[in-house]
Amino acid sequence: MNNQPLLLCNNLCKKYQEGQVLTEVLKNVTFAINQSEMMAIVGSSGSGKSTLLHLLGGLDTPTSGEVLFKGHSLNKMSSGARAELRNHELGFIYQFHHLLPDFNAVENVAMPLLIGGKNRGQAQKKAFEMLAAVGLEKRAHHRPSELSGGERQRVAIARALVNEPSLVLADEPTGNLDLRNADSIFALLGELNRQQGTAFLVVTHDLNLAGRLNRQVEMRDGYLQDELTVTGAL
């Protein structure tokens, strides 16, 4: 049996230099996430949560430390290899859906498949199946402007999962939604986790929603803490 973590983060540090000012955003962050695990990171704005997700997704490089995905160091990968990793192994969900406004829902969801080399027919078939999985098969041919906020975020989730990634990185995925839609989105993530075995690493301000996940940690002043402080996490 393979006990290797899906993703391992070792002593990750990130510093930014602006003129004479050195800002340390992440300080010796170490943790692992396993296959099919759902983990929440809570923390106040500016605590380093989004920076951490960018490093984990290979969108930025650390000042020191390393990120290993399935035992392979992102630090040692070429930019092309990291792009391939993002296309095939990682999914991304953001607070704002970032859907392409001139394309309908099924075309938006199919985009990662087309980028990955699938033909249009295969991509559209898989995209429609994914929209059905998030309950939007009847809205497949609507553009983002014709969808509600909750529906747009469901399309974004379908797009993130269409390549069947091992891990989805979600940055405030319910931040722009009302409580009812936020609750529905988190329920959907849990259902997809059970059905597909996808691991989720979710950044959120909502402690109640974070409590639904397997594990909760807090980003505080650049450090990752296992103990949550309610005032610091809201």
Curated annotation (Swiss-Prot):
Which cellular component, as a GO term, is one annotated location? plasma membrane
Binding annotation for ATP: 43-50
Which CDD domains does this UniProt record tie to the protein?
A: ABC_MJ0796_LolCDE_FtsE
A biological process term (GO) from this entry: protein localization to outer membrane
Coarse class of the primary localization is: membrane
Highest taxon in the source lineage:
Bacteria
This entry's Gene Ontology molecular function terms read:
ATP binding; ATP hydrolysis activity; transmembrane transporter activity
Instruction: Give the membrane topology, semicolon-separated if more than one.
Output: Peripheral membrane protein
Q: What is its EC number?
A: 7.6.2.-
What Pfam families does the record point to? ABC_tran
Location in the cell reads: Cell inner membrane
Annotated keywords: ATP-binding, Cell inner membrane, Cell membrane, Membrane, Nucleotide-binding, Translocase, Transport
Q: Where in the numbering of this chain does the ABC transporter domain appear?
A: 7-234
> Which family is annotated?
Belongs to the ABC transporter superfamily. Lipoprotein translocase (TC 3.A.1.125) family.
PANTHER family linked: IMPORT ATP-BINDING PROTEIN (PTHR24220), LIPOPROTEIN-RELEASING SYSTEM ATP-BINDING PROTEIN LOLD (PTHR24220:SF689)
NCBIfam families documented for this protein: LolD_lipo_ex, PRK11629.1
What does the record give as the function of this protein?
Part of the ABC transporter complex LolCDE involved in the translocation of mature outer membrane-directed lipoproteins, from the inner membrane to the periplasmic chaperone, LolA. Responsible for the formation of the LolA-lipoprotein complex in an ATP-dependent manner.
Task: Quote the subunit structure annotation.
Answer: The complex is composed of two ATP-binding proteins (LolD) and two transmembrane proteins (LolC and LolE).
Q: What is this protein called?
A: Lipoprotein-releasing system ATP-binding protein LolD
